[in-house]
Amino acid sequence: MELMYHYTSLSTLQCLLDNISNNNEFIFHASSIYSMNDSQEFIHGYNVVLDWLKKYEEEQGIKENRLSEIWDNYLENHTKEEFNSLFIEKLYKEEHIPYVIAFSKKDDSLPLWSMYGVDGKGVSLGFRENFLRIERNKSIKDCKVELESKIGVLDVMYQNAPNLDELLNNALEWQYKQYLEDANKNEREHLLRVQMEHLGIATIIASPYIKHPAYAFEEEKRLAIYKRDEDKVLYKINSKGNMISYIEIPIPKGNLQSITIGPCVDFVSTKRVLEQQLDKHEFKNVEIRQSEIPYRQF
């Protein structure tokens, strides 16, 4: 059984244990994609989507009302940065916001301890990815993305990955056909609005699962969910001192299978306290293990 691993701090793990719901669920914070650690991450995903749009339009022989032309038209009088700012602001206003939780396929990775594991003083939590469910009858406000009965957990695709084109084709081809139908129904003066709407939807479908190839070593998986009408958006200050938005995502506590204690943590005493708490909350068969990474702090 393959697991996915979430690197975090001991204080976050303590908070998860202290706030287990009456339904025996952890309450995780899924952060807005626009609030991720790398502020350019979403824009990178957008650029990959834009390249796909241009390639698709050439292959399909689409000559008029190209969705990708919104970029070239806007750049005639504005900078790339101005367009990016306008585009993200529009997505914010229309609440087209993917919320994500990052995991990895690697349970004990030196660079991941450094980047996400509090410089080796955190933990890596191993979860089964099945049974991550939301209610089927939940809705999304003003957005043509339908939720399935499961929260989406997918491998992140790194640019130039051999299966990236397949992912984009599956995710975006139907959306482009919907755009053409809407574009043909509207007058020219309304085309920009239609383009912005569909470009936004295409981007939020694909961008949560695309990262720069420099991050391929993370072997990341992402749990992504799109804001529903009844989801309450909350706010907090992250470890970098930035204000971010998030929504709460329940994950059954039974999905927790392992806890790897970071290489710079006192393993014996931490393991003892964790075992007491796991017994208190009636966890079954959670393996607590010590990192094997020879980690040096600076």
What are these regions (language model features)?
Residues 1-298:
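Partner-binding and oligomerization surfaces adjacent to conserved cores of proteins
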